[in-house]
Amino acid sequence: MTELPSQPAYYDDLGLSFEEAWNLVEAGSTDRNSPAHTPTVGTVDETGAPQLRIMILRDASRDTRTLRFHTDFRSIKAAQVRNNGVTSVLFYDMSAKLQIRMSGQTQLLPIGDVADAAWSNSTPFARRCYMAEAAPGLPIAGPSSGLPEWIQGKKPDEAQLADYRPNFATMLVEIQSVEWLYLANAGHRRACWQWQDAQKSWQGTWLVP
């Protein structure tokens, strides 16, 4: 009989599973090589249909229950968030065999301290994306980066970037639920946690995988 590998400490521990979920997600905001650095982010369009895309996780905090992403304020995605802030973020770590889904409400913040700090702390090349002359997703005649010809292949300076600051916005997702799935030959483990506003705490339960 083949002996199954030993399982991690969180395998049958609801509290440790919750901590590991946040450990993985928080690592994704600081480690560009982490699988959690580029999760799938889902919003809802005007027809109620889900719209998915890969985004870079810029910040994550279990203390404030927030995830932060950056977007173009003119984008379809931004319009969806303004119309309906319901958002779901999916992480998958193949090596750890972990899937984590975090869901909540998103605020679109084009101005304010959070957006200003995020803009200032981004590299010039990252901010160059917001110099596109038209809104992301609009049809164009041929293949193009959408950037003005004079900045193609060049690093913009602060003066050049300043005029395009209004195109930048942060997406701040306030997490209200966390779902966890760990895959194991010995038997999968699944759990979820809901934020309880009245108690200011998380309430978790095991689920059938």
Q: Language-model segments: which ranges?
A:
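Binding-site signature for planar aromatic cofactors or substrates
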Residues: 1-209
